[in-house]
Amino acid sequence: MSFMVPTTFAAPQTYRLPCPTIQVQTLGPIVPSVWTIVSRYEPFRQLVVQAHLQDFLNDPQTIVTVMAPLCIPTSQTTQLVCTDASTSPTRVSVLDLSFEASLAMVQSVSVPGVLTTDTMNQSNYTAYRTHHPYRMLHVKSKPTILLNNTSHIVVGNVVASNGLVHIVDQFPMPI
């Protein structure tokens, strides 16, 4: 029987180089959330705030695709709002919708998961489930992407940290 004889290896000498202390800065999120992108468009931002869904669109664990319209076909009313006891009330224009109507409108244009324009172009006609209990988003893709036979995508595939945002020209659902 042969046994292996233990061998020793000489480790090279290590030298400690003087290095300055490195300060590490933590940067904020580089890619904005869906709420940050949607809040750039004032009519839809008002609709999301009225539906109290800004925390839902800002949640990093929720992966969602939102079709944000540039205009919303509702009337606006003005309300007197007091921001501070020392200042006089100011007039603010708000959408003339109830909470339930604005919630249904936002839910009907948000699709769970990531839905890119390439995915929409793969078939001629597809219906996608939305966050609304019974409304679907119908997509025709030949020759251009048409949502519910009413609206076109103006800017597509705006990447967010928790999903995608597509900017559409008008609201794709009947109110």
UniProtKB/Swiss-Prot annotation:
Pfam families: Fasciclin (PF02469). Coiled coil: none annotated. Disulfide bonds: none annotated. Residues 28-172 form the FAS1 domain. It comes from the Viruses. This is Putative FAS1 domain-containing protein 081L. It comes from Invertebrate iridescent virus 3.
